Structures are given as structure tokens and as C-alpha cells.
Amino acid sequence: MNKIVKFFTLLTLCCPIVACGDYLDTSTPENADDGFVTSTASETFKILSWCYANYRQNCVMGVYRWNDPIGSDAEYYPEVASLNNANARLQPELLSIGTANSAFNGYYTIVARVNKLLDIIGTKEEYIQAKEAGEVNEWTQLYGESLSMKAFCYFELVKHYGDVPYGYENTTASEYSLNSRFEILDKVIEMFGEAAPLMYRLGEGGITAERMSRGFAEAMAGMAALYSGGWQTVRTDVQGLYGDVQLETKGVDEYSSIYARRTDYLDYYRTAETYFDQAMADKGTATLVTTDERGYADNPFQRHFQYQHDLQLSPESIFEIGNMQGGQSGQTTSSEYPYAFGRASNGASQMGAPCKVFGAVRIMPTFYYGEFEDGDMRRDITATVTGSNGDGNEAILRFAPGNKLDGGMTTNKWDPNRMNPPYVADQRQSGMNWPIMRLADLMLMRAEVKAVLGNDVAARSDLNDVRRRAFGDTNHDIQSSGDQLLADILQERKLEFAGEGQRRWDLIRNGLFVEKAVEVRAEMSQMVADLQSKGYHEFANGNQIPMYIWVKSVHRDNPLTYDADPTDPALYPGWRGQYDYSTTDAASAVKGTDHNLAIEGLFEYIDPSSERAKQLEADGYVKTDWGKGIVDNADHYCNSNLLPGVKAGNVPPRYYFPIPFEVLSHSNGKVTNGYGLAQE
């Protein structure tokens, strides 16, 4: 009964305006008079602050956000036989019905609060006068921000749950019914479009990337149109659900669902193009990070991520959810960067050097070895072959399934060693913000849409602006057109955003998910076969992944490394090493003085019986399993953990979470879970 009462509080949405604590206070607010808490713009923003915090604490991780980047042809989850990634493996039928309740409830809680807020702000004279005059002030910003928050929550609900109830906020409903995702996304586009002109651009009116801005609202309107027009898995078990929307399909029906796209998709791509153009015009101070002012490093791509490590806002960021480091008892927040998304560490939960990093997002070896061109500065930032032992020493990652140092190569975009200084008091309290959208994402989504619509010149312009940052020159510009240009843009998005959560959705909406899943399964199987028969596998670019590598602990005065130096095995690949933990509160955890790893044979086969191997071992290098770990766990890497839900090749990708049981039980049968998801 308590669960039902709680759920009704959240979904029926009879929710008063409440006084809230500061932006990061996630405790339940006390009831207060509506007029008081909206008496000034600063008091009103406290309500929005609570909504931002509720999204961070209950929604973004309530749908296990690391599921977004671990179900693709570039990323995977490291553990074996875990239900944590059943959704990402495209096996949602294994999930319990309560798997993602907190996010579902959290979204509707936010919708209720901002909807009430919209009603109150909409009657304020300061808002009415500014809107009628076509001016932006703090009240129009708050109204637009509230409306954007509502639209954002519904977009996320459709993205992660499919067709859901819509429009019940601040009403007393005795039962609920499903609404078509297409109907909801039309409303989302409309809401973002209405909100945008009421809001400041980044840099205006004190608005930073920790708040929704005009450019973000326009980018999200474009994104909603892109998702509505793209391929997606729809239900076939609810008659009349999609009304007059006509769909084309591919593959077969499975679990009463099928892979489909609306036939008028080009209309939605045109809408997306319009909003993406507006977002670029209204981006304010957001700018692509194309230079690196640091004298000790020259990697503009990494410079963007370094801002996050420094607990600063990157100039490239359009929107990110604010966080805080540490905090008093009862006020701590979840910092999944770097814990779930970062470079792995075997460290202790507290006072580690560095603390534990689980590393839920792992990078496919076929992607790391086979898809980056020479000179692409993104490779060593995107993935790493080493982690942290937790005692101040660098350690090679292992392909045995597991977490921390086990599980394979991790992302390298977030590494506790890059903080200054690393937060060693406790795991998951780094204080790093949750990134939601950066400018390169907007640019490449716009390029994608323009390519589909045949505007190749404009598409190439955005594409090559991003590539020039990656290579530092114009020599790698793309000159393709038509279908090949679209393929090049999607590949660029893969290279640019691996580990960030975009690749899975890029493939789904472009109708390529099943095709690419089958391809990567075949690539991994061929790699394993070659490792078994030859001791290595060679990729088209000449890189070789071997069964074994040779590693050696070495001393460096500064154990934290930066740009790669191919002549120094301790500096190649680059951007690894360790922070000097002897200078931190975790100094007692540090062991030894040779904290770095020199690596030989990572990209070329060294015959274990060769003179070179013997000389390396004589020099103190240790022969270490590398590709052998993949061979020893071939089923995990080629089958059971690699997108098995679509291995048949002609079935729909099923990637949704279940709607909570309480909704189903109070809908008189009008709301059910589809896609093979649990009903109770």
C-alpha cells in the first residue's frame, strides 16, 4: 500500500509548490505558501534547483545512464551474467518490472512541479509585460526554463520507456492510458519551441551551462524532431496506438514489436534542421575548444574534458547537470564521473590512491585498434589500456570479465588522476558534473540532418570543423557526398563521442543498429580466430592486437603523462600514468617509487620465442596476457555479452525499460508493458 500511495503522489501529480534548499539539496522540501516561494526570481529558482537535483539523483541514474554507451558496436559492459546491462544487451525481458521505477517516478515528479510553476509565473505581471514586449528578463527565463524542463523529462521518458502516459500533471486521475510517442514528441517540440525565445543565450543574464538556455532548448527541439523521424522500435500489440501515423518497417515482429520509421520522416528532419540552425545561431558563448593553452600538453580534445576534472565549465558545454564534491552527511551527491564512466581503479572505497573506479563503460578492442586514423588525437583520450592499482601505481587492464582492472579497456575521458588534486576521501564524490550536451554534438547532429536532406556542403562544413580539432589540420577533411557522407558523419560521431552515450542512439535512429551489431560480432569472432591461430589479429589500418604484451614498472619524476611519444614505451600510448599521491591525504596508500608502466608490443606482434622477446625479458619486462584474455573468454566477448538480443539479424532492437507496476495496476488494463518486458 505504501508503494501505491507513494506512486500516486508522483504520477497523479497533485503537488503544491514547495520551498526548496539550494541547487544541490536533494532532501524533501517543506511545504510553504506558493506566493512566498515565487515572490522573487531567486526564490522561484530554488524550485527549479530542486528539479535539477532530482533529475541528477533519481532520473539520470534511475535509468542506469551508463546503459546508453554500453550497448553498441563501440562499447560494452564488463561483467559476466549481470542484469545491470540486460537492457543494453537487448534482452529487456530479463529485467524485473521495478528496474527503473525511480527514474520514471522522478520524471513525473519534476513535470508536476514545473507545471505548477508555469501556472504561477504565467500570471506574474513582470513576465506578462516582458513577453508582450518581446523581451527576455529573469521571469521569462524562469518560465522558459520550466517549460524546457517539462519537455526534457517527456523526451527522456519516450527515449527510455517508449509510449507512456501524458498530460496527467496536476490532475486527480483514477486511471491512466498510453499516449503515442509520436504525439508526445510533437508536444515536446512545441514546448521547446515556445520556451526558446523566452530564454537567455549562454552568457546572457548570468546563464551558464549549468542551466537550460535558449540554444539548448532549440537544440533539444531539433533532437526531438530527429528522434521522432528516425527509426525506432514500436509496439504492435496496442491497436490504434499511433493513430494516423504511417510506418515503414524492417525485419520481423518479435515480442509484439517491430523496427519502424514514420513515412513522413523528412518533414521531421526539416524541422530538426530549422531548430539546429537556430541553436547554432543562439549558442551564445558556447564554442568548440580548438586550442590548448597548456604549455605541457597540446590536445584540444582532452582540454574540453580537463575542465570537468578541474570542476569548471568547458566553453564547449551547452548543458550539464551541476554537482558538488564531498558534502556534509546527508547532503552528498552521486558522482558517476569517473566512477562508472572512467579509467578503472582497484583502489579502496575511501582514501584510495585513487579510490575505486568501477568502470561500467568499456571500449571494444576492434574499435580502438581498427578505426582511429594516425594522428587522431582522440584515440588516447577515448580509451586506455591501463588503469590504477589504487596504491599510486599504474596497472595493465585485463580482459577477464569483471570490474575495476578486469573487464577490458575503459574510457579515458574521465580519470581521477586528472583531477587537481584527486578527491581521495571517498568514491563517487568527485563533484564532476553530469554532461548532457556539448557543441560538437549539436554540430554533428546538424550535419547528419543536412546530409539526409541533401545539403552536402553545409553538412561537410560542420563535420570538418570537428575533424580539424581532432587532427589539428585540414589534411583530413572529408570530401564525400550523398550516402557516403552520411556514413562518414555517423563514423565521426562514433569517434568523437565513444563512451559518452550517443553511438547506440545514432545507430537506432538511422536504422543501422542490427546491421552493425551483427558486423561487430563477426569482427570479434574473426579476431579471436586469428589470435588463436596466429597469435595476433591484424586490422585494415595495419595495427595488430597480440596475445601477449610486455610490461615493466619504471620511474618518472612526474608519473602523470600527457601527449604520446612513440619513442618512449612509458609515454605510448599517451595520457595515462598516475597522479603523485604522495602529495595527497592518501599518501599512506602509496607503494614503491616506480609508478609508471612501459609497454612493448601493444600494436605489433612480438613472437614470444623471438630474440626480441628474450631481450625484453632480460631488460626486466614481463610477458603479460593481452588478447589471450579475450580468447579465454571468447563467448563473453563474441556472443553472450555482445548484443545477443539481435544476433538473429532481422529482429527489432529492444532497448526500453519497464513502466512501473503501479501504473499498470491502476490503468484498468489500458497501460501494459511491451517489447517482452515484465507485467508484474
Where are the regions a protein language model picked out?
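Bacterial Sec-dependent N-terminal signal peptides
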Residues: M1-P29, D506-R509
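Long, intrinsically disordered, low-complexity segments
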Residues: A19-G21, Y107-I110, Q246-A260, Q306-P338, ...
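An aromatic- and glycine-enriched ligand-binding surface/loop that stacks and positions planar moieties
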Residues: G21-A88, V164, R211, G215-E218, ...
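Conserved, well-structured interaction surfaces
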Residues: T40-C59, V80-Y161, T171-A209, M409-L439, ...
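Alpha-helix C-terminal capping/termination sites
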Residues: E156, H160-D163, Y227, W231-V234, ...
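Flexible, polar/acidic helix-loop-strand segments at domain edges
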Residues: F367-R438, F661-E680
